[in-house]
């Protein structure tokens, strides 16, 4: 904990509000709320935490806080700040999953549509439905029963829907407002669980058609009734009062939370939504934020009633959402809440089991890799890759995998210092030397295996440093790629020979991940270096920008990149206008290719 944080912790007030955690670049990485700021913020820096919270705390270098006059103000402000800053440690609600609704448009001649967007346009919306198939089946049934207008724009003549009895053709014939309203009322009644009455009417019409010997019509009505029963089949969980409800069950363990939302529509459980995410506040506070964002940010329609556990601040949620909030204590409602919480607990347990299984599989892959190359299991693997274009701005990068898992905090970047021109072997010798001379000097653990992105020459260069210069016996292997730049072969030994590995094995997949990761890290660093080098040299070559002026500009703007992004007007405040124009045009006329 740095001095800045220590000093700020001593000044925290005993009031509600929001806090914004920042990393070393000043980027906001987490936003939270608190009933008592002093207690909540201090808790991050005292006592023990789960691994997720430890990771967050490890990145915090500073924080801000905003005092509010009430808890509800703190909650509203938290939602605003999360939306504005999009901090990486705040839970991300799913944007890509929206449920379908059936819509009756607010038009002179209404239409029946399926939509995933609910708007305040005067239309009637029914749902959500569990999936597009369920909504489509219901709409098809209603189209057969109620011939509302189908075309988006009125055609000049009747369409196919008129001929099959699914449209009254208001484009050609007069359809009264009363007729349209009657159909809208019937559809509304049907979708609000009045299908039993409508089914009875259809049954009477079917029997009448049979009595009149109109067997084709009777069969048609019989099929319609069967379709209705299929579409509107009652589910196990149903309520007699037909109230629309959302039930929020949650469970948490090991720094993770699962929230299951049960959608109850017209008294029936039609669908659930599952979210699993790491959390960093008190569990009840995290759930409160989740529910608020669920409705305020993601366009979910608020039902007439919400069920939540007793640990949630009922009054605060009620004030924020302006809807009825219930904490069931007995009976069918409590059973439904318990069911949601049980499902949440099971989903979380399943996630942990999958994580554990994946970890076991990864560790097993590490052990099998060791067996394949004839060494002990390489639990710590360090991989190197060089990157340059014809020897320009040469760099190298190293990644670390422990038990098959990337350790990104241990990754390292190297600018090549001693090698001139495109000398890949010389670059490899330099970075391997720099890495392991330092580890030996600092008495830090050496890897069990060194992986080189390259073939025989790169392997030999690395072994020359490890074995001949440093006298270490660390196994070194190389990864060769095919003509499509994909991991192709594992090379080992002196001279290197191909180690046979099944391409669909977990150990081969592990090597592929390592090679892809070190290449990604190296190429990203090289692009950054090239861009910086381009800007720096471009600034140095501008007439009128000498050493003194260059330093003054860098001090004012902070970096060459910021100078490049500055407008001519901003630059003119520090240099003559003509020179400002020259600087702006020179830095922006050419951009390095990625």
UniProtKB/Swiss-Prot annotation:
Residues 196-231 form the UVR domain. It comes from the Bacteria. Signal peptide: none annotated. InterPro entries: GIY-YIG_endonuc, GIY-YIG_endonuc_sf, GIY-YIG_UvrC_Cho, RuvA_2-like, UVR_dom, UVR_dom_sf, UvrABC_protein_C, UvrC. Keywords: Cytoplasm, DNA damage, DNA excision, DNA repair, Excision nuclease, SOS response. The keyword Cell cycle does not apply. It is found in: Cytoplasm. Residues 14-91 form the GIY-YIG domain. Pfam families: GIY-YIG (PF01541), HHH_5 (PF14520), UVR (PF02151), UvrC_RNaseH (PF22920), UvrC_RNaseH_dom (PF08459). The UvrABC repair system catalyzes the recognition and processing of DNA lesions. UvrC both incises the 5' and 3' sides of the lesion. The N-terminal half is responsible for the 3' incision and the C-terminal half is responsible for the 5' incision. NCBIfam families: PRK00558.1-5 (NF001824), uvrC (TIGR00194). Interacts with UvrB in an incision complex. This is UvrABC system protein C.
């Amino acid at each position: 904990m740095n001095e800045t944080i220590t000093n700020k912790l001593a000044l925290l007030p005993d009031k509600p509000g929001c806090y914004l955690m920042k990393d070393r670049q000043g980027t906001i990485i987490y936003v939270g709320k608190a009933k008592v700021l002093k207690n909540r913020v201090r808790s991050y820096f005292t006592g023990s935490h789960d691994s997720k919270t430890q990771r967050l705390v490890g990145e915090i270098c500073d924080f801000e806080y905003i005092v509010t006059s009430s808890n509800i103000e703190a909650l509203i402000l938290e939602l605003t700040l999360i939306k504005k800053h999009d901090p990486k440690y705040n839970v991300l609600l799913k944007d890509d999953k929206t449920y379908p609704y059936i819509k009756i448009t607010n038009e002179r001649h209404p239409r029946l549509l399926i939509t995933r967007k609910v708007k305040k346009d005067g239309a009637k919306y029914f749902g959500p439905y569990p999936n597009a198939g369920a909504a489509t089946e219901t709409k098809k049934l209603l189209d057969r029963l109620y011939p509302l207008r189908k075309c988006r724009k009125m055609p000049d003549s009747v369409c196919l829907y008129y001929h099959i009895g699914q449209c009254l053709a208001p484009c050609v014939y007069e359809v009264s407002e009363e007729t349209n309203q009657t159909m809208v009322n019937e559809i509304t009644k049907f979708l609000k669980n009045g299908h039993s009455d409508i089914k009875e009417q259809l049954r009477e019409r079917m029997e009448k058609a049979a009595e009149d010997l109109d067997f084709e019509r009777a069969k048609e009505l019989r099929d319609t009734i069967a379709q209705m029963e299929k579409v509107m089949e009652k589910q196990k969980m149903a309520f007699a009062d037909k109230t629309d409800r959302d039930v929020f069950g949650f469970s948490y363990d090991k720094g993770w939370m699962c929230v299951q939302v049960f959608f109850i529509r017209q008294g029936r459980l039609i669908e659930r939504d599952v979210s699993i995410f790491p959390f960093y506040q008190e569990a009840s506070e995290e759930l409160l934020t989740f529910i608020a964002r669920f409705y305020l940010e993601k366009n979910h329609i608020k039902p007439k009633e919400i069920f939540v556990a007793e640990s949630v601040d009922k009054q605060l949620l009620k004030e924020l959402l302006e809807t009825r909030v219930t904490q069931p204590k007995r009976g069918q409602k409590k059973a439904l809440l318990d069911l949601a919480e049980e499902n949440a607990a099971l989903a979380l347990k399943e996630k942990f089991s999958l994580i554990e299984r994946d970890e076991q599989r990864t560790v097993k892959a590490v052990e099998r890799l060791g067996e394949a190359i004839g060494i002990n299991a390489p639990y710590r693997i360090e991989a190197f890759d060089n990157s340059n274009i014809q020897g320009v701005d040469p760099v190298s990068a190293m990644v670390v995998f422990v038990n098959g898992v990337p350790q990104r905090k241990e990754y390292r970047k190297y600018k090549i210092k001693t090698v001139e021109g495109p000398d890949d072997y010389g670059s490899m010798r330099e970075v391997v030397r720099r890495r392991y001379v330092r580890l030996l000097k600092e008495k830090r653990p050496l890897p069990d295996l060194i992986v080189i992105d390259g073939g025989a020459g790169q392997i030999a260069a690395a072994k020359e440093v490890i074995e001949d210069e440093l006298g270490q016996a660390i196994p070194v292997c190389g990864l060769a790629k095919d003509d499509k730049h994909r991991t192709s072969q594992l090379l080992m030994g002196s001279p290197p020979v191909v180690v046979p590995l099944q391409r669909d094995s977990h150990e081969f997949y592990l090597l592929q991940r390592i090679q892809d990761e070190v290449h990604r890290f190296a190429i990203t660093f090289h692009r950054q270096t090239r861009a910086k080098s381009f800007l720096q040299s471009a600034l140095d070559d501008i007439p009128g920008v000498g050493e003194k002026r260059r330093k003054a500009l860098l001090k004012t703007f902070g970096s060459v990149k910021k100078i490049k992004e500055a407008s001519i007007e901003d630059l003119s405040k520090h240099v003559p206008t003509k020179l400002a124009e020259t600087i702006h045009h020179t830095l922006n006329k050419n951009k390095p290719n990625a």
